[in-house]
């Protein structure tokens, strides 16, 4: 309720979008956690989408309702144990921002031994997955990696991958120190259109598509 009241206050003050961060269940072993009503995929998804649906009702049409989601849920069919089910989230948000930082993906994702070494490929494939699954029901605007040793080339590769799919983007650096050489000028990027090229088959290698709760970005199961 407190978060919803803050969102309403921000919208009344003229903010045009409220992005809810870390709206999820703990990414931990649920066998040692206790929740009112239990913790099944159905209850988790219902809880998270229920909160966002109420937020959208209370702040709209003054504000857009946005949510950060874990990046790996773009490419798994379940909720990842945290209540993030992409198709359901698309119905209750105006904007979804997957945190698809390449250094968060384990060996084997998208066919890469080291996904961190393929920043453009990780963004391209994960975004194609989420665009196919949401089918225009919400705007996709990913968080991209500007930390962990990435320089201008790696940052720009991610931006170019998002831009090529008609997507806007945001950069994350915990200290708000950004790689200036990797950020394009305004006339070097497209106006977001979210009209991507035909989606190609990008399912992860065998063993990844149905990720058990709390496994997340980990190695092959």
Can you name each region flagged by the protein language model?
Residues 93-107, 116-207, 212:
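Substrate-binding cleft of secreted/luminal carbohydrate-active enzymes
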């Amino acid at each position: 309720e407190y978060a919803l009241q803050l969102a309403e206050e921000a919208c009344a003050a003229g903010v045009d979008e409220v992005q809810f961060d870390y709206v999820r269940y703990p990414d931990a072993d649920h066998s040692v956690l206790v929740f009112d009503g239990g913790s099944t995929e159905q209850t988790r998804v219902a809880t998270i989408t229920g909160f966002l649906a109420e937020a959208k009702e209370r702040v709209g049409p003054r504000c857009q309702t946005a949510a950060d989601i874990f990046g790996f849920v773009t490419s798994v069919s379940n909720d990842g144990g945290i209540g993030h089910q992409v198709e359901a989230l698309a119905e209750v948000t105006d904007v979804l921002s997957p945190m698809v930082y390449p250094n968060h993906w384990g060996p084997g994702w998208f066919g890469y031994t080291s996904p961190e070494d393929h920043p453009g490929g990780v963004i391209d494939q994960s975004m194609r997955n989420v665009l196919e699954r949401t089918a225009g029901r919400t705007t996709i605007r990913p968080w991209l990696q500007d930390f962990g040793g990435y320089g201008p080339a790696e940052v720009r590769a991610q931006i170019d991958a998002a831009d090529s799919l008609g997507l806007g983007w945001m950069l994350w650096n915990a200290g708000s120190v950004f790689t200036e050489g990797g950020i394009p000028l305004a006339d070097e990027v497209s106006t977001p259109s979210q009209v991507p090229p035909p989606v190609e088959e990008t399912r992860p290698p065998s063993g990844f598509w149905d990720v058990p709760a709390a496994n997340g970005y980990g190695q092959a199961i």
